[in-house]
């Protein structure tokens, strides 16, 4: 930052030749100083730390993260080990900042063992693997559920439709694929190799993590991390606080050469003066982050780099590379700065003098004590008198003294249990030195036999000494050659890394591929940012919202599919076709693979979500029972999914089942599948129709079709259904629709019946074709094809063995959209062989045409080609569109002659509730109230669009949704809304018309 003051004389002297007056110089310097201060404040994001921190703790976190984040230490609440918790939040943000934050699926980040509710509330593009390894994990999940419920209840609009993205699987068992991962204090339970194996299972190449670090763990059995006020201690097992007194040599040997210890050693972390929860972790896992360098696993080599060690926290990164790794010596060392002023002293650990241990003592204390002991030693005095002299000096050098009324610490206090043994060891050391010096002197005057024995080679003398030690162990102190041990201030680890991974990794090709992918994604993000900036500039300043917007994933045909489950053995036929020299066959095979993977992930996500709820409610994989707080768990999940319910073995449901809803499957200890009335099971919204796994399996069993795909891309109301009716030939054709409602409409248009045997045989949904037996045909007529995934369309053609597909749809209306935000959808867009346009509408009245043109101009990026800029209407109705403001849902005029559409499910639910209050027939609120997405393809005389909230809703800004809403009517369209919504495309265009 700039200094807070400046010297006017120096400014004039240095700038006077430029002709500026003193006042101008002052103004210029003040402006520059202010700008620099503003830039300093803006350079980091705001991070609010609510924990109460001491002045010292505040300095620790500011020194570590103050330069990167705009820290706001609000001192709101006391929390257990508050600094560690505050650092954990900053560590999470710091590790996430290492990766792209585009919000695209290809930039998904995994969090091994993290807090999923933190990412959910902050809108992070993160999937958490949060396994339930014990009671503490289940307690944390329960607490997170409560926090999530509390936040959602305070601001339901912000979280409308959002689901927390996490699973309860161990990291190595989760199937979500992502290139990046973080592990915030999660490595204690996995170790270095465990993290590498989890990365391999997820297809992860870079992981960044943190953990508590103290190099003295390699030497000591206990210690303190002063910045965290944390004391650590090695114990042999979780139930016996016995010290690990393994000698240093044994510890280093075990560290370097052995992976197996006789007894499992744990490290207990306790926070000093805080009677709160402590932590116990396996020493082998912790040690692996200090000693290991690389690990080769399933064709990948993973290397760890220790990046920053600050405030007792080590930040590390693990990077996986494929292919061959040539031999290389990897070296790192761990320093022990806390023992540089100490020396090791061996003292007795047992009364028989057989067991000895090493203690640390200040070099200055030992040096002065030994000097006095050597000078005052007299072999004619009783050993106890000399022992008392040593103890007196030792006490004086390690106690508190008072000088001129001021207390001063002399040296360092010695453990009361070691004090007398230290003095005794110094006495023995002194006596041994005098005896050794005496023997050296006597050798000058020794007899010939003594001289001959002394002249023996050292190996012979060592042999005799070893024999005496083995036969007479209690004599060992007399022959002890070393009492003092020089303590090394570091330990070094060298490891040769070499791995034959098969093919060489083509880094150049990978760099070109990543660059191409990044350019494509960057253009998408730039367009989204420009659109958001234009929206903000068009809004009044006092109404700008600070809430973050998560960019939506955009299909990109230049990159590979990430996020699907890899099942190569089951995809051999389609996989081979993806390498076909015929481009369209390769494209169709790739799309079918993606569609199969997408449906499989939908199924896996459903199972994962239900298993999570089952476990939260106290269930397991063995018993058909739940033991948790059912009401609390299900009330919490009900806020995000109103279809969540529990069926008891008595046949009773916890909540009333909505009318007309029948659950086809349920979940319990036997997994997901059909259940009987006598079983205990749970359900959610995905259990009504659960056919994703079957669709995936069927698609995998097919081959990509080679027939011709023709698309008629027509405007809304151009007569697509009429065209299907005119060209349909029962002997050679089958009509396929995207959903059940469209199938019923086509059946009524062709056969005047929606459920007759003939109508159901010739007009079927795409799902019905794939899941049921059906005859082969030569031609498929597809209605509203844009609602289908390209892979599903190809699967339908393959199942029917059709040589031609004639597809009708509007490429600018609502297209197929993923129901799983974590899936990287890239090949869903239809790729036709032939395309024809139809720009004349017979449905939409005359005044709708200029409205849609205006919407296209405002919503679509400049340069975008749209057939709606030139479309025309043949309707005789000239004026049809009106709008009015309403105060609440009670003022919506519900009329059985009108068709009602909403943008959101919440508004639809409000209208249905209002219809029930007015005792309108069930057929009305079942068939006459739909969302815009559900009403695509529908044609009605009178349509009313209802918006009951003025909170942010991006659907009112999207051209495709607004286009569908405004083109469903033939006679009248009425827009009824509550309040003003910034960016409401329909309202703005109606106002300008």
UniProtKB/Swiss-Prot annotation:
Gene Ontology MF, one: ATP binding
Alphabetized PROSITE patterns for the sequence: ALPHAVIRUS_MT, PSRV_HELICASE
Segments forming domain (+)RNA virus helicase C-terminal: 839-993
Gene Ontology CC annotations of this record: host cell endoplasmic reticulum membrane; membrane
Chain residue ranges for the region called Disordered: 537-565
Positions of the (+)RNA virus helicase ATP-binding domain: 687-838
Pfam family for this entry, one: Vmethyltransf
Keywords: ATP-binding, Helicase, Host endoplasmic reticulum, Host membrane, Hydrolase, Membrane, Methyltransferase, Nucleotide-binding, Transferase
Superkingdom of the organism of origin: Viruses
Binding site for ATP: 714-721
Endoplasmic reticulum listed as a keyword: no
UniProt region (Methyltransferase), positions on chain: 50-409
This enzyme's EC code(s): 3.6.4.-, 2.1.1.-
Subcellular localization: Host endoplasmic reticulum membrane
Family the entry assigns: Belongs to the bromoviridae replication protein 1a family.
Functional summary from the UniProt entry: Involved in the virus replication. Contains a helicase domain and a methyltransferase domain. The methyltransferase domain is probably involved in viral RNA capping. Involved in the formation of ER membrane spherular invaginations in which RNA replication complexes form.
Subunit structure, interactors included: Interacts with RNA-directed RNA polymerase 2a.
Protein known as: Replication protein 1a
């Amino acid at each position: 930052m700039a200094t807070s003051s400046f010297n006017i004389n120096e400014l004039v002297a240095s700038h006077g030749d430029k002709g500026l007056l003193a006042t101008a110089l002052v103004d210029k310097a003040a402006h520059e100083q202010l700008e620099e201060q503003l830039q300093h404040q803006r350079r980091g994001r705001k991070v609010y730390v609510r924990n109460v921190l001491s002045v010292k703790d505040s300095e620790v976190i500011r020194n570590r993260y103050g330069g990167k984040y705009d820290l706001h230490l609000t001192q709101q609440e006391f929390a257990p080990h508050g600094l560690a918790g505050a650092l954990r939040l900053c560590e999470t943000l710091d590790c996430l900042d290492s990766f792209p934050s585009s919000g695209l699926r290809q930039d998904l980040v995994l969090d091994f063992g993290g807090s999923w509710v933190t990412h959910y509330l902050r809108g992070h593009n993160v999937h958490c693997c949060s396994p339930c390894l014990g009671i503490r994990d289940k307690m944390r999940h329960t607490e997170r559920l409560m926090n999530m419920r509390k936040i959602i209840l305070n601001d339901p609009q912000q979280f409308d439709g959002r689901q927390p993205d996490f699973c309860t699987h161990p990291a190595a068992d989760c199937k979500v694929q992502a290139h990046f991962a973080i592990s915030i204090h999660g490595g204690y339970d996995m170790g270095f190799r465990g993290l590498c194996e989890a990365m391999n299972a997820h297809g992860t190449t870079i992981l960044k993590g943190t953990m508590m670090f103290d190099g003295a763990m390699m030497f000591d059995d206990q210690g303190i991390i002063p910045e965290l006020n944390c004391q650590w201690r090695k114990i042999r097992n979780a139930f016996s606080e016995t010290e690990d007194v393994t000698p240093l040599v044994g510890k280093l040997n075990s560290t370097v050469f052995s992976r197996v210890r006789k007894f499992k050693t744990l490290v207990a972390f306790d926070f000093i003066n805080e009677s709160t929860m402590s932590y116990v972790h396996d020493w082998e896992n912790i040690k692996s982050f200090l000693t290991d360098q690389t690990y080769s696993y399933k064709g990948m080599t993973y290397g760890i780099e220790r990046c920053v060690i600050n405030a007792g926290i080590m930040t590390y990164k693990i990077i996986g590379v494929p292919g061959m790794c040539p031999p290389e010596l990897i070296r790192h060392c761990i320093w022990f700065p806390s023992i540089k002023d100490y020396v090791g002293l061996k003292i007795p650990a047992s009364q028989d003098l057989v067991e000895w241990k090493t203690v640390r003592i200040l070099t200055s204390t030992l040096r002065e004590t030994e000097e006095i002991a050597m000078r005052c030693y007299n072999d004619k005095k009783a050993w106890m008198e000399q022992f008392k002299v040593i103890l007196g000096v030792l006490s004086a050098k390690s106690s508190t003294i008072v000088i001129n009324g001021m207390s001063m610490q002399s040296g360092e206090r010695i453990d009361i249990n070691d004090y007398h043994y230290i003095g005794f060891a110094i006495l023995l050391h002194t006596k041994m030195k005098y005896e050794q010096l005496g023997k050296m002197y006597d050798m000058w005057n020794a007899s010939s036999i003594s001289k001959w024995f002394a002249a023996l080679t050292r190996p012979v003398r060592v042999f005799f000494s070893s024999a005496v030690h083995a036969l007479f162990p209690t004599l060992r102190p007399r022959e002890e050659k070393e009492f003092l041990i020089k303590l090394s201030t570091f330990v070094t680890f060298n490891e040769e890394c070499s791995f034959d991974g098969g093919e060489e990794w083509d880094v150049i090709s990978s760099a070109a591929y990543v660059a191409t992918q990044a350019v494509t994604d960057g253009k998408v993000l730039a367009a989204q940012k420009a659109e958001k900036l234009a929206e903000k500039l068009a809004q009044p300043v006092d109404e700008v919202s600070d809430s973050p917007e998560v960019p939506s994933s955009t299909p990109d045909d230049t990159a590979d599919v990430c996020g699907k489950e890899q099942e190569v053995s089951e995809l051999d036929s389609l996989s081979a076709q993806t390498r076909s020299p015929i481009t369209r066959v390769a494209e169709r095979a790739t799309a079918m693979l993606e569609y199969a993977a997408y449906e499989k992930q939908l199924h896996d996500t459903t199972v994962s979500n239900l298993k999570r709820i089952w476990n939260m409610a106290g269930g397991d994989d063995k018993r058909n029972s739940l033991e948790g707080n059912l009401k609390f768990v299900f009330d919490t999940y009900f806020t995000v999914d109103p279809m969540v319910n529990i069926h008891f073995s008595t046949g009773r449901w916890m909540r009333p089942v909505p009318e007309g809803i029948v659950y086809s499957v349920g979940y319990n200890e036997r997994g997901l599948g059909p259940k009987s009335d006598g079983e205990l099971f749970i359900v959610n919204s995905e259990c009504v129709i659960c056919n994703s796994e079957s669709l995936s399996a069927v698609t995998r069993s097919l081959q990509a079709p080679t027939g011709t795909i023709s698309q008629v891309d027509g405007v809304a109301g151009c007569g697509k259904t009429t065209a299907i009716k005119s060209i349909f030939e029962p002997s050679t054709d089958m009509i396929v629709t995207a959903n059940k409602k469209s199938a019923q409409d086509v059946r009524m248009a062709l056969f005047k019946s929606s459920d007759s045997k003939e109508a159901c045989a010739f007009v079927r949904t795409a799902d019905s074709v794939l899941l049921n037996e059906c005859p082969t045909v030569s031609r498929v007529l597809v209605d509203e094809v844009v609602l289908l995934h390209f892979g599903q369309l190809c699967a339908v053609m393959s199942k029917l063995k059709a040589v031609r597909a004639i597809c009708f749809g509007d490429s600018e209306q609502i297209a197929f959209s993923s129901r799983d935000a974590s899936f990287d959808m890239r090949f869903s867009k239809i790729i036709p062989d032939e395309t024809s346009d139809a720009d004349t509408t017979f449905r939409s009245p005359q005044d709708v045409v200029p409205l849609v043109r205006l919407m296209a101009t405002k919503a679509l990026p400049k340069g975008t080609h749209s057939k709606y800029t030139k479309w025309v209407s043949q309707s005789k109705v000239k004026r049809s569109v009106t709008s009015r403001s309403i105060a609440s849902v009670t003022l919506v005029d519900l009329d059985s002659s009108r068709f009602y559409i909403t943008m959101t499910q919440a508004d639809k639910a409000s209208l249905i509730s209002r219809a029930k209050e007015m005792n309108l027939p069930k057929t009305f609120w079942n068939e006459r109230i739909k969302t815009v997405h559900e009403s695509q393809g529908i044609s009605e005389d009178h349509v009313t669009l209802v918006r009951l909230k003025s909170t942010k809703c991006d659907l009112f800004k999207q051209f495709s949704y607004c286009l569908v809403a405004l083109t469903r009517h033939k006679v009248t369209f009425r827009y009824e809304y509550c309040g003003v919504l910034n960016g409401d495309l329909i309202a703005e265009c109606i106002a300008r018309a």
